[in-house]
């Protein structure tokens, strides 16, 4: 709740600053004289910006299960020893992290895992068969610790709120620019014309791309923190380092020589700005130098 409150206050503060800046520069007076209500537009933009993000968060668990075909393990009747071990491991990690025990699921796919859910005490941790088949139990436990750390850190809520903030500004700025082009450049004086709608569409695309870079940057910072969280829950950084090395195709114990290789959702060059995960080598290097407490 504190995290949500702080982000909402931050969003409100930024909106107020933006509104005040426009008033000082005279943009507010010009647009208002032309029939545009900035206060109303800010409220409209916030509603649009946050509604989609919050709905996505609330639907994240069922959507994740549906999209991956994940099968939730019955905590009272695991089908085999591996499922029993998974349940026990996730529950132990959750207890150490001080959160409610998540649902645990398995899905068919390449080595990967994820955590989702709107609440710390009502989340889902899922792991792929590919990851279970390619890692040792200690490495799998480290990956599970990484996902539990995401839940404990409130990363799903944090990124949802960040997405809501940037969505708000994408919607708001696109319409301000569209109104300016329509009235000041195209000299349309009756309602809004095609120039307004065309400009809004183009601006939403451009601003949306820029906004995704911001969200991706925040996501990468949360990945570093979740790696450190796994090391803390495991009592050692080595299991997570070995798990990352295996995910990146490195030999266990091999030290990275550069930061050029891709991460789990590997990207290079300009596309790296849009990646939700840092490069594997960067994560290993950060974990090796992280202060664990």
From Swiss-Prot:
The chain crosses the membrane at residues 4-24, 38-58, 161-181, 198-218. GO terms for molecular function: metalloendopeptidase activity; zinc ion binding. Its EC number is 3.4.24.-. Keywords: Cell inner membrane, Cell membrane, Hydrolase, Membrane, Metal-binding, Metalloprotease, Protease, Transmembrane, Transmembrane helix, Zinc. Zn(2+) binds at residues 146, 150, 223. Binds 1 zinc ion per subunit. Its cofactor is Zn(2+). It is an enzyme of class 3 (hydrolase). It is found in: Cell inner membrane. The keyword Cell inner membrane applies. The active site is at 147. It is a multi-pass membrane protein. The keyword Thylakoid does not apply. GO terms for cellular component: plasma membrane. InterPro entries: HtpX_protease (IPR050083), Pept_M48_protease_HtpX (IPR022919), Peptidase_M48 (IPR001915). Pfam families: Peptidase_M48 (PF01435). GO terms for biological process: proteolysis. Belongs to the peptidase M48B family. PANTHER family: PROTEASE HTPX. HAMAP family: Pept_M48_protease_HtpX. This is Protease HtpX homolog. It comes from Bordetella pertussis (strain Tohama I / ATCC BAA-589 / NCTC 13251). The gene is htpX.
